[in-house]
Amino acid sequence: MTTFRFCRDCNNMLYPREDKENNRLLFECRTCSYVEEAGSPLVYRHELITNIGETAGVVQDIGSDPTLPRSDRECPKCHSRENVFFQSQQRRKDTSMVLFFVCLSCSHIFTSDQKNKRTQFS
């Protein structure tokens, strides 16, 4: 959120300026000689949110990948107990650690937060 600062003496807007000698951020008035130190060295922050899918990279032959861990969690669709799992590919602050399971029988994708029986990893 952007906030504006105003001069205490003449009420004009203050502009950011770098104090190169002391390596700090200042706000100064262009009308009078008023200068104040910034509370934070941050002028602007731009957070990028990527819109990749949580299951990005899931392909038809995911079960043949020997690097993926296996589980015997029951598939809610076909009740098979053969699946592989991986963590969400989203890297955001508000994303919790959710495991995605891919059933090797029917390719159904389900998550660890669904109400299923306890998972035993192999």
From Swiss-Prot:
<dbReference type="GO" id="GO:0006368">
    <property type="term" value="P:transcription elongation by RNA polymerase II"/>
</dbReference>
<dbReference type="GO" id="GO:0005665">
    <property type="term" value="C:RNA polymerase II, core complex"/>
</dbReference>
<keyword id="KW-0227">DNA damage</keyword>
<feature type="binding site">
    <location>
        <position position="10"/>
    </location>
    <ligand>
        <name>Zn(2+) 1</name>
    </ligand>
</feature>
<feature type="zinc finger region" description="TFIIS-type">
    <location>
        <begin position="71"/>
        <end position="111"/>
    </location>
</feature>
<comment type="similarity">
    <text>Belongs to the archaeal RpoM/eukaryotic RPA12/RPB9/RPC11 RNA polymerase family.</text>
</comment>
<keyword id="KW-0479">Metal-binding</keyword>
<dbReference type="GO" id="GO:0003676">
    <property type="term" value="F:nucleic acid binding"/>
</dbReference>
<feature type="binding site">
    <location>
        <position position="103"/>
    </location>
    <ligand>
        <name>Zn(2+) 2</name>
    </ligand>
</feature>
<dbReference type="InterPro" id="IPR034012">
    <property type="entry name" value="Zn_ribbon_RPB9_C"/>
</dbReference>
<keyword id="KW-0539">Nucleus</keyword>
<dbReference type="InterPro" id="IPR001222">
    <property type="entry name" value="Znf_TFIIS"/>
</dbReference>
<feature type="binding site">
    <location>
        <position position="78"/>
    </location>
    <ligand>
        <name>Zn(2+) 2</name>
    </ligand>
</feature>
<protein>
    <recommendedName>
        <fullName>DNA-directed RNA polymerase II subunit RPB9</fullName>
    </recommendedName>
</protein>
<feature type="binding site">
    <location>
        <position position="7"/>
    </location>
    <ligand>
        <name>Zn(2+) 1</name>
    </ligand>
</feature>
<dbReference type="GO" id="GO:0005730">
    <property type="term" value="C:nucleolus"/>
</dbReference>
<feature type="binding site">
    <location>
        <position position="75"/>
    </location>
    <ligand>
        <name>Zn(2+) 2</name>
    </ligand>
</feature>
<feature type="modified residue" description="Phosphoserine">
    <location>
        <position position="40"/>
    </location>
</feature>
<dbReference type="GO" id="GO:0006283">
    <property type="term" value="P:transcription-coupled nucleotide-excision repair"/>
</dbReference>
<dbReference type="GO" id="GO:0001172">
    <property type="term" value="P:RNA-templated transcription"/>
</dbReference>
<dbReference type="Pfam" id="PF02150">
    <property type="entry name" value="Zn_ribbon_RPB9"/>
</dbReference>
<feature type="binding site">
    <location>
        <position position="106"/>
    </location>
    <ligand>
        <name>Zn(2+) 2</name>
    </ligand>
</feature>
<keyword id="KW-0862">Zinc</keyword>
<dbReference type="InterPro" id="IPR012164">
    <property type="entry name" value="Rpa12/Rpb9/Rpc10/TFS"/>
</dbReference>
<dbReference type="InterPro" id="IPR019761">
    <property type="entry name" value="DNA-dir_RNA_pol-M_15_CS"/>
</dbReference>
<feature type="binding site">
    <location>
        <position position="29"/>
    </location>
    <ligand>
        <name>Zn(2+) 1</name>
    </ligand>
</feature>
<comment type="subunit">
    <text>Component of the RNA polymerase II (Pol II) complex consisting of 12 subunits.</text>
</comment>
<feature type="zinc finger region" description="C4-type">
    <location>
        <begin position="7"/>
        <end position="32"/>
    </location>
</feature>
<dbReference type="GO" id="GO:0001193">
    <property type="term" value="P:maintenance of transcriptional fidelity during transcription elongation by RNA polymerase II"/>
</dbReference>
<comment type="function">
    <text>DNA-dependent RNA polymerase catalyzes the transcription of DNA into RNA using the four ribonucleoside triphosphates as substrates. Component of RNA polymerase II which synthesizes mRNA precursors and many functional non-coding RNAs. Pol II is the central component of the basal RNA polymerase II transcription machinery. It is composed of mobile elements that move relative to each other. RPB9 is part of the upper jaw surrounding the central large cleft and thought to grab the incoming DNA template. Involved in the regulation of transcription elongation.</text>
</comment>
<dbReference type="GO" id="GO:0003899">
    <property type="term" value="F:DNA-directed RNA polymerase activity"/>
</dbReference>
<dbReference type="GO" id="GO:0005634">
    <property type="term" value="C:nucleus"/>
</dbReference>
<keyword id="KW-0240">DNA-directed RNA polymerase</keyword>
<dbReference type="GO" id="GO:0006367">
    <property type="term" value="P:transcription initiation at RNA polymerase II promoter"/>
</dbReference>
<keyword id="KW-0597">Phosphoprotein</keyword>
<keyword id="KW-0863">Zinc-finger</keyword>
<dbReference type="InterPro" id="IPR001529">
    <property type="entry name" value="Zn_ribbon_RPB9"/>
</dbReference>
<keyword id="KW-0804">Transcription</keyword>
<feature type="binding site">
    <location>
        <position position="32"/>
    </location>
    <ligand>
        <name>Zn(2+) 1</name>
    </ligand>
</feature>
<dbReference type="GO" id="GO:0008270">
    <property type="term" value="F:zinc ion binding"/>
</dbReference>
<dbReference type="Pfam" id="PF01096">
    <property type="entry name" value="Zn_ribbon_TFIIS"/>
</dbReference>
<dbReference type="GO" id="GO:0006366">
    <property type="term" value="P:transcription by RNA polymerase II"/>
</dbReference>
